[in-house]
Amino acid sequence: MKGPFNLSEWALRHQSFVWYLMFVALLMGVFSYMNLGREEDPSFTIKTMIIQTRWPGATQEETLRQVTDRIEKKLEELDSLDYVKSYTRPGESTVFVYLRDTTGAKEIPEIWYQVRKKINDIRGDFPEGLQGPGFNDEFGDVYGSVYAFTGDGLSMRQLRDYVEQVRAEIREVPGLGKVEMVGEQDEVLYLNFSTRKLAALGIDQRQVVQSLQSQNAVTPAGVIDAGPERISVRTSGQFQSEKDLANVNLRLNDRFYRLADIADIRRGYVDPATPMFRFNGTPAIGLAIAMKKGGNIQDFGKALHARMNELTADLPVGVGVHTVSDQAEVVEEAVGGFTSALFEAVIIVLLVSFVSLGVRAGLVVACSIPLVLAMVFLFMEYSGITMQRISLGALIIALGLLVDDAMITVEMMVTRLEKGDSKDQAATFAYTSTAFPMLTGTLVTVAGFVPIGLNASSAGEYTFTLFAVIAVAMLVSWVVAVLFAPVIGVHILSADVKPHSAEPGRIGRAFNGGLLWAMRNRWWAIGITVLLFVLAVFCMRFVQNQFFPSSDRPEILVDLNLPQNASMDETRKAVDRLEATLKGDPDIERWSTYIGEGAIRFYLPLDQQLQNPYYAQLVIVSKGLESRTALTERLQKRLREEFVGIGSYVQALEMGPPVGRPIQYRVSGKDIDLVRKHAIELATELDKNSHIGEIIYDWNEPGKVLRIDIAQDKARQLGLSSDDVARLMNSIVSGSPVTQVNDDIYLINVVGRAEDAERGSPETLQNLQIVTPSGTSIPLLAFATVRYELEQPLVWRRDRKPTITIKAAVRDEIQPTDLVKQLQPDIDKFAAGLPVGYKVATGGTVEESSKAQGPIASVVPLMLFLMATFLMIQLHSVQKLFLVASVAPLGLIGVVLALVPTGTPMGFVAILGILALIGIIIRNSVILVTQIDEYERDGYEPWDAVVEATEHRRRPILLTAAAASLGMIPIAREVFWGPMAYAMIGGIIIATLLTLLFLPALYVAWYKIREPKRD
């Protein structure tokens, strides 16, 4: 009668086919490795949409009530909505739609469609004259390649012509996605009028505008069917240059005026300026290039570099092309570094195998590694997983685990060969005795990573490939151990294996002595272990908490926030002062400056800032990590001492979901003045803590407004309306569009405005002469009064409530999460004293960390259920399930021993490692308990079964622990993986020792096993 199916026995009977499978797997794995995409970090979805609307001429309050509030109300109908945030300026509304962090990436396109549909449904409710709404759901696009074009002796228009030329030519690069220009300034033809002169001539500026628009209009003149052909009729008159404008003769009030005689015509750039861009302090135009999704960044980078080199070689002298950001180079360095770490880990694991198992047995284990890696690479290619920080780190972590099964199989084969079995018998016995305990251990280990795989947050999406790669590697390693390793083993292992000496060595004797002491003094052993565990729990308070560490890239971000009523020109002057201190700094490779907006998203986790005239951001590339640290300290000191009154923040690039300033508190309520008052009080309270850095508000101070109160009855008698006066004032102060001039590929706006002397001072507005429809001129003060008042220029709201966010950096080495814990009693006390309807909420690092860890906590019960189910299938005993599971929490002892002395923080990734540690620990425990069962079935006394099983499984358990822990050494020095590696190394080492000492003591105590009396 045949026994149960034995996969190893089947493999030995079909060796040719198995060798063929191994060859195909290796070959396909090599090709997959070559085809895998390369990235610096895994992508994750930015679950944010921006809705922008303009209502020219409206006040901030009108825009808030009639536009922003209507949009926010409608968005509340979204099922997946987390919250709505908005800011409203006079005539401008910007609404941010944030989806719940657990929203799946595949659901988001449909949700954005629903947002557009809902807002379109209320278009009829918006006021007249509204422009938009416009939708931006491509907020997360990454422009990995950014070039700066500078022009020595060239105007901005001339430089832009060359940039446009390059932009058009690079379209042929394979894989090219979006291309954006940064810092370009649109040309404008200004018609600067003297209002006094126009009034003296009795000319209404609106007449001038109407005449120019009529002449420049593009109107069809018809088509003539002339027999066999069609002839289009064209009229002349369209403006092609400022000269055409200057020569226009206008008929106004039955007289002809040459435009150049009544207006000063100048070609310039839009004023006030749009966001500006600089490179190393020199005005520049940036060209930001994104790759299409799913491409290979290294291949794309090579093709782009080659094409850019061809194009820049043809540019004239004076045009400089500089690299601002090169993602392909960054990825090549990052992947190269991680690939080197992977090979280091392979060498370490192989050394462990050869030293512990011997050359032949170690060679069998060595052969299993490329087989597993090949099949994992194959899976990665077909599932769309690229080689990046997370997937390569997962491979390194998996490497120490995937050799476990092969080691156990080979060690069992060697043991049976020592007892005189043939190679085939040894291989089939290894399957019978270890295959299913190994499978259970593998499934339990994989279950430990389930919270990562099922975490739907942005952080979970960022780390998902950790679960996918490790899970597949573990499952494949079991297949290799039971299918391929026996076949390799029968060819490599020697049939004439000499038995090991029955007498244990010095280490073996010491271990046996410790084991027997623990079993004989079981309650002491259990008590000491429990005491150590309680001590470890207590010491967890000394472990600093962290969300994600800073990136190891050399860039530094410097934010400058001027008072919110500051002009773009004032911001530029502040930047000039800072850039003057950067020139010649030995720690700086290069820098780029964005004035009036934040840096374009050249790096996915960038906390991108919107356009604001009072804001600037510098991206400084240091010459290395040491230079980055020194430069950061110098900049912080300089900004604090020399840039008083300007909010500044210096930071390295972030990893994981973007946060910005780590300490954030939101104060919200109904009344803006009360919200401002409470926000200032809270900021004052925060400033008392010595660890709090510079504090800023996202909005606070009111701005000055010049209000013109029109006497409506007098205005109507003169034939004027409020609309007429508002349009006239706008054309005088800011300028109003008149028409456009076609200039090559550009459409240049012609803008009419008052001359500099008349629009440069608020006082001059009071003396303006207004031309009435009857042609007479009258001073503004004849029917209006002018006065100053304060108005809120900007209002941020969250979930339809005015909300001020207080933001601060952290001084010293304290982690933001720990600082928030320190502050919490004071915050609670402050919040308790607020009126009803006003509240304080914590944001920043703590909030983002909570969003990431919340989904993990919700999946932990499923993880425990899966582990318990797999264990019950293997053990068939609730009592043994308890014994095996009891060792898992004890890994915390090793975690604390590793983290506290080294000062390593506990971050999001370290938490994932600790959860995974549970499965790894249980894996060894279940193998030991299963071995005890086998010895008892073979007739051993219970005491002897525990002793023999522990001694028998000691070597493979220690070997797998050594491979798993030592294999993580290459990533322990990485900023990102270091905390996880330290936690897992410490946990594995201590838990392994406890598995071999505490578990036997607990086993004999639980089953009340006594040591038999010996004769």
What does each model-found stretch correspond to?
Residues 1-38, 432-434, 501-548, 589, ...:
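Signature of alpha-helical transmembrane segments and their immediate interfacial
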Residues 5-7, 62-138, 196-217, 238, ...:
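Solvent-exposed, membrane-proximal periplasmic/extracellular interface segments of envelope transport
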Residues 10, 52, 123, 169-347, ...:
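Extracytoplasmic/periplasmic membrane-proximal domains and adjacent transmembrane bundles
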Residues 16, 24-62, 106, 120-129, ...:
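Transmembrane helices with small-residue packing motifs
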Residues 20, 59-66, 103-114, 144-147, ...:
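Solvent-exposed, non-transmembrane alpha-helical starts
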Residues 28-35, 347-414, 472, 865-954, ...:
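Hydrophobic transmembrane alpha-helices and their membrane-interface caps
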Residues 324, 331, 335, 410, ...:
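Helix-loop junctions and hydrophobic alpha-helical segments within the transmembrane domains
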Residues 399-413, 434-454, 461-500, 618, ...:
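Transmembrane alpha-helices and their membrane-interface boundaries in multi-pass membrane transporters
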